[in-house]
UniProtKB/Swiss-Prot annotation:
GO cellular component: plasma membrane
Membrane topology type: Multi-pass membrane protein
Alphabetic keyword roster: Cell membrane, Membrane, Transmembrane, Transmembrane helix
Subcellular locations according to the entry: Cell membrane
Organism for this UniProt entry: Bacillus subtilis (strain 168)
Regions crossing the membrane: 42-62, 71-91, 102-122, 130-150
Listed InterPro entries: HXXEE (IPR025671)
Native organism taxonomy: Bacteria, Bacillati, Bacillota, Bacilli, Bacillales
Pfam family, one: HXXEE
Protein name: Uncharacterized protein YrkK
Highest rank taxon of the organism: Bacteria
């Protein structure tokens, strides 16, 4: 399972780097999907979220007996699968312009995270109810956290 968790960390890191490079400029155009965000705001938020993802992965690896650690990790896995579709894929289709994060979302996050989830099912580590509830809870927390991180990023960045 260590390799699968490492692949998750690799995938989310590349995805967040893609977003960090191009999303701040992309967000400046009028859109229903994203309010304009500065590089400082976004970079701060994406670093914190990446750190939380790594913490969830390491928590699962080092505390395999902890249901909470497992739920947070599978919540991140599921949330990042959904994130590839909404907003990235839907924004690209609706706006007829590439939304940063789509490529890594479709080519890395969906297959890698789906593989990790599949392996967890094979090893009887999770059931559907845990995956669905964890994805919803972690997804809602991340959605609520993002605007707060943007505000903090604006304050702490030079």
């Amino acid at each position: 399972m260590v390799y699968f968790v490492a692949f998750f960390c690799f995938a989310i890191t590349l995805h967040n780097i893609e977003e960090a490079i191009w999303l701040p400029e992309w967000s400046q155009q009028s859109s229903k999907f994203q309010k304009p965000v500065t590089s400082n705001e976004f970079h701060f938020a994406v670093i914190v979220i990446t750190m939380l993802a790594y913490l969830s992965a390491f928590g699962f690896l080092y505390m395999p007996e902890s249901d909470i650690a497992k739920w947070i990790f599978i919540g991140f896995l599921g949330s990042m699968v959904i994130n590839a579709i909404f907003p990235h894929l839907i924004a690209t289709v609706v706006m007829k312009k590439y939304a940063p994060g789509l490529l890594t979302g479709l080519l890395l996050n969906i297959p890698v995270n789906s593989l990790v989830i599949y392996q967890m099912f094979l090893k009887n580590l999770i059931v559907w109810k845990e995956l669905i509830i964890s994805t919803l809870v972690v997804g809602i927390i991340l959605l609520a956290l993002i605007p707060l991180l943007f505000k903090v990023g604006d304050k702490v960045s030079p």
